[in-house]
């Protein structure tokens, strides 16, 4: 799972811009682009982005754990 790509995808779906997210986070546009490039990010940042975009990115990790457990032989 590449969280940066998933954040960008959600932004695109919502029609939000890099400038908009940068303002919401009080980050530079460069830092938002760096987030898009990251496979993982700090949980505090992910929590803020989840709140701003009104989307639970943490559920993607939970779902991934469930999928992993279902693929493990007993």
Annotate the PLM regions:
Residues 1-20:
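A short, Lys/Arg-rich alpha-helix, primarily the initiator
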